[in-house]
A protein has these predicted regions:
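C-terminal motif of bacterial Sec signal peptides marking the signal peptidase cleavage site
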Residues: 15-18
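Short, non-transmembrane amphipathic alpha-helical segments
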Residues: 84-107
Length: 138
């Protein structure tokens, strides 16, 4: 019985030590676009109105075996609360198609995280509302 408890304890420890997710983010590893970042931003501005676009990259390793590479796009939009959910969904479809058409090394990316943010600052108080949508690229 003592050996069984020891075996069970060690098995449980090994299980929980191996089941973890590590997310790495690098600010200097921006993805490349066929038309450059500024050109990509201009093409998106033709479709819909936003104040600022931030582009980033992330890598997630799950259980040490599978790896997920993704693209982060954050759009600063005024009056986000007035935009309907169906319009947000149509925006994400357009953004996904533009990314597929303009992203270099598309096969290296699995997902795109699209975030729409509205920031309101009053004195020391900063309030951020956001909508986050994850779409598969391939």
């Amino acid at each position: 019985m003592k050996n069984f408890k020891l075996f069970l304890f060690l098995t449980t420890c090994l299980f929980f030590l191996n089941c973890h997710t590590i997310t790495e983010s690098k600010s200097n590893s921006n993805p490349d676009f066929k038309v450059g970042k500024a050109g990509f931003e201009k093409r998106l501005k033709r479709q819909f109105d936003f104040d600022k676009l931030s582009i980033g990259f992330y890598t997630t390793k799950k259980n040490g075996s599978s790896k997920e590479n993704g693209l982060n796009l954050t759009f600063k939009i005024n009056n986000l609360e007035t935009i309907s959910d169906s319009l947000i969904n149509s925006y994400t479809d357009v953004i996904k198609e533009k990314v597929k058409a303009n992203l270099l090394h598309l096969k290296d990316y699995n997902y795109i995280n699209i975030t729409f943010e509205n920031e309101l600052t009053k004195g020391n108080l900063r309030k951020v509302n956001s909508i986050k949508i994850k779409k598969q690229l391939n």
